[in-house]
């Protein structure tokens, strides 16, 4: 994209056609909403803004380092009803299976379905709709700072981490606060700024691991707050002959190298010959690419001896599993997605929680309410903290934890628990699946740490 001085306005035309006319203005452009980051969270928020009748005329600026999206991730989730992105669902399953040493179980998921959406389909659908809206503008750039402005003083810092820098931003209390977003060669102001810009890239796992190590550098292992990565490498494999039962999603197969942590294979059949097969690990540090590939090669060779296949797509990533705040903000800047603590800390599940967070934000904007981005209730946050403590301090193998939970409960109950929608009685049934002598001391330590 050519670089011009001044403020850049990309007209609402196909987002890939970034050579559209760019208008230059000597004054800072002002928008009702600025969305910093056009990933899953940023584009989900944009989608719900476009669906809200009272907000459709609001001016919106979406900023991302590139709008040339790739199929960089796969989102899976479960729900009972049609989702906001039901037309994008590539596959769904009504039966899952769990496997561990000496344990194999198939579980019907009714009334839930387990669903898959490919990242590229999601990106393209939202951006295609957005390009038809004259009130939505796009800026392709790397953001260098996000700051709070007010009517009485210049900007101070907010604790917003960008890919290239970490800004510490605290604004003074005053009326008519606005926020300023800056990038090389330009800036814009917004009445609200919603940022999902992480200080690392999820698909560059080495930068992710370096970031988490830097957060608690110098802290003794006993005093570290739990921070694990759900890191993975997956392949879409296509066999020459039918080998998969397309009706069953293999949610967790723990019969793989555990890497001194919690590791499992994730197998989602797209049809009888094709599946996404993903090696997933919960641990403090990530592996080399060769290590993921070695396990994937061995798993496929053992599971499908003599069969031939080709790899049509691969993906790699790291999702933070922690309750450490990745950013602290003040109005009118708000964090969303992983940066805004939307991810469920004990499992890394994100898509449905991001949808809930973004829908809540738009509902608050619609009703003129103060913006609250928190979505995880206190009870389920406590459960997450306890499970994280057990996994982080290796009090019990993750394979045994999940085997016990799925062995003694229906899949629908587990899904409700993992979705933070379970009742207290259902929670008790889940807890009864796990050894008290391990989880009770962990719960006490979590309570003492929070006191």
Per-range role (PLM):
Residues 143, 257-259, 283-360:
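FAD/FMN-dependent oxidoreductases across multiple families
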């Amino acid at each position: 994209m050519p670089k011009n001085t001044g403020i850049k306005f990309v007209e609402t035309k196909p987002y890939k056609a970034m050579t559209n006319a760019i208008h230059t203005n000597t004054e800072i452009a002002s928008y009702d909403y600025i969305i910093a980051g056009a990933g899953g969270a940023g584009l989900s928020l944009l989608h719900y803004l476009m669906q809200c009748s009272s907000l459709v005329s609001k001016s919106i600026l979406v900023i991302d380092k590139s709008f040339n999206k790739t199929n960089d991730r796969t989102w899976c989730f479960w729900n009972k009803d049609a989702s906001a992105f039901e037309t994008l669902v590539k596959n769904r399953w009504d039966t899952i299976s769990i496997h561990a040493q000496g344990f194999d179980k198939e579980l019907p998921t009714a009334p839930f379905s387990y669903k898959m959406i490919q990242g590229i389909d999601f990106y393209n659908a939202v951006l295609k709709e957005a390009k038809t809206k004259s009130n939505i503008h796009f800026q392709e750039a790397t953001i260098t700072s996000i700051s709070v402005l007010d009517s009485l003083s210049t900007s101070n810092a907010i604790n917003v981490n960008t890919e290239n820098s970490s800004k510490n931003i605290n604004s003074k209390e005053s009326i008519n606060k606005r926020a300023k977003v800056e990038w090389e060669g330009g800036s814009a102001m917004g009445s609200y700024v919603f940022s999902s810009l992480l200080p690392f890239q999820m698909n560059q796992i080495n930068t992710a691991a370096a970031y988490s190590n830097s957060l608690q550098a110098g802290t003794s292992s006993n005093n570290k707050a739990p921070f694990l990565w759900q890191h993975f490498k997956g392949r879409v494999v296509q066999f020459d002959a039918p080998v998969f039962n397309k009706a069953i999603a293999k949610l967790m197969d723990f019969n793989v190298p555990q890497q001194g942590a919690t590791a499992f294979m994730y197998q989602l059949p797209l049809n009888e010959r094709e599946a996404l097969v993903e090696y997933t690990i919960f641990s403090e540090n990530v592996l080399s690419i060769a290590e993921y590939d070695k396990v994937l090669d061995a798993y496929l060779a053992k599971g499908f001896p003599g069969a031939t296949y080709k790899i049509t797509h691969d993906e790699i990533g790291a999702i933070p599993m922690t309750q450490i705040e990745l950013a602290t903000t003040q109005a009118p800047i708000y964090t969303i997605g992983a940066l805004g603590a939307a991810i469920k800390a004990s499992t890394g599940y994100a898509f449905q929680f991001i949808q809930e967070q973004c829908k809540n934000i738009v509902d608050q904007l619609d009703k003129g309410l103060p913006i609250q981005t928190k979505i995880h209730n206190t009870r389920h946050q406590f459960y997450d903290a306890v499970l994280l403590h057990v996994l982080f301090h290796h009090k019990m193998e993750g394979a045994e934890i999940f085997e016990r939970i799925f062995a003694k409960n229906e899949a629908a109950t587990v899904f409700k628990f993992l979705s933070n929608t379970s009742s207290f009685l259902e929670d008790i049934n889940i807890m009864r699946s796990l050894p008290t002598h391990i989880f009770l001391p962990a719960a006490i330590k979590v309570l003492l740490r929070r006191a």
